Amino acid sequence: MTPDIILQRTGIDVRAVEQGDDAWHKLRLGVITASEVHNVIAKPRSGKKWPDMKMSYFHTLLAEVCTGVAPEVNAKALAWGKQYENDARTLFEFTSGVNVTESPIIYRDESMRTACSPDGLCSDGNGLELKCPFTSRDFMKFRLGGFEAIKSAYMAQVQYSMWVTRKNAWYFANYDPRMKREGLHYVVIERDEKYMASFDEIVPEFIEKMDEALAEIGFVFGEQWR
């Protein structure tokens, strides 16, 4: 997936985009992204009816295609994370010994239906997801709990990022600037084929349902960028 194709389809030069800016939000419109994929793979408690969180995300993506507008998110926790992300990345590079290249958005293929926004692509071939927890309690939970303490939504995010990029491993790091020392902790998450099989099955079904719903109201995917 080349920058030229993205430019041709969206009018946006991805090489000039930074995570979090207006162009970045526009590139994600109607696209199933890593941070939200836990909604797509959410399973019903019984029967086949989609859970509320899956249905809600479905309607959100449809609205983004039809309006070309993303819902506003102004959470304090997001602002906190953004504020310390560069410090976290620098400390991670120093601690791990790998070089990190920023990458605003990566699409799985030319359909542009699925994408992830890594916090970095590492010189050893792995990806990087950085979290700067809003509370030190959450940092402590991960610091002591490791893999077991990673939220299911975050695990889905990392596994989906590997599905999109076809990488085999991903660093998952937490940074807390309030810690007097030992403020960075990370683990390496390996590609899990169970997740891959789940994405292979559920994501195309979800996209098909999106296209059916869009057709019903007279829209097609891609109109969000016109």
UniProtKB/Swiss-Prot annotation:
Gene Ontology molecular-function annotations: double-stranded DNA 5'-3' DNA exonuclease activity; metal ion binding
Catalyzed reactions: Exonucleolytic cleavage in the 5'- to 3'-direction to yield nucleoside 5'-phosphates
Pfam families recorded: YqaJ
Cofactor: Mg(2+)
Chain coiled-coil ranges: none
SUPFAM superfamilies on file: Restriction endonuclease-like (SSF52980)
UniProtKB keywords: Exonuclease, Hydrolase, Magnesium, Metal-binding, Nuclease
The keyword Magnesium is annotated on this UniProt entry: yes
Top-rank lineage group of the source organism: Viruses
EC nos: 3.1.11.3
Binding-site positions, Mg(2+): 119, 129
Gene3D superfamilies recorded: 3.90.320.10
Enzyme category, top tier: hydrolase
Subunit and partners: Trimer of three subunits that form a toroid, with a tapered channel passing through the middle.
Function, in words: Facilitates phage DNA recombination through the double-strand break repair (DSBR) and single-strand annealing pathways. Also important for the late, rolling-circle mode of lambda DNA replication.
Identification of the protein by name: Exonuclease
Lineage, highest ranks first: Viruses, Duplodnaviria, Heunggongvirae, Uroviricota, Caudoviricetes
Primary gene name: exo
